[in-house]
Amino acid sequence: MYLYVFLIIADLLFSLQFLFNQQFRKRNGDGLDSAFTFSMYTNGISFLILLVLNGFKLSFTWFSVLIAFIYALVLLLYSYSGLKSFSTANLSVYSIFTMLGGMLLPFAFGVIFYKEDFTLPKAACILLIGIATAMSFEKGKGSKDRGNLKYYFAVFILNGLVGILSKLHQSNAELCVDSGSFMATVNLCVFAMCLGFHLVRNKKVPLLPIKEVGNLACYAACSGIGNLLCLIALTTLPASVQYPIITGGVMVFSTVISIIRKEKPSVKTLIATAIAFVSTILIMF
């Protein structure tokens, strides 16, 4: 049962991280430099947080480093696409596209390649969240909105790949390292890539105001701890159970946060959130 508590906490943290991501984009734009600056700071800070949580001990294997490197590339693309998509999406709609990809692809991966059971509650959960997502999508008006649709699909696919890589790593016990070491290695890879990008492209390291660093530190804490909790849960829970819970939970928390921030989600979004909540409860019990 405690693993479900971990996932609920992770849901809340992932929902909050969207808020800090959105604030960064508003102040710094959504260009390539901004995306790499965002990733450099957040992953550097997250690495330090995980290093402390792991007792200043890190383990490495060739398999973990390889998966971490691929994972890092996916995260960079995901970060850039996320910043670009915020130019038209509100918090609840963006999170729905992100989390749906994070649910469906790992779900299918677990069922097809790891022979996880495809039960009636799981099928009902997938169907309900699919309906919720379709209801929540609000077609943009104008060429700018249509042009950003590609970024919605990008975060859909890339977040799904994050789940697949996590499942792949955690399912190979003889080759993988502990969850804290793996996520710290991922963060270190992203930080190194972003630092190299700035040194080659701009010949300098971007410096941000203390207030902005604080905002990114909040994002890093939410992302780093949330991903760590998910990896710990994934050592026991099937991907076909875990990722629907994450998806439904984030949809619910994100919509609540949107209401608190007076973004006024539509009636369809509220109904979709209720459906997501029911589907999450269904797969847990």
Segments (PLM) and residue ranges:
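Polytopic alpha-helical membrane proteins, predominantly small-molecule transporters/carriers
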Residues: 1-285
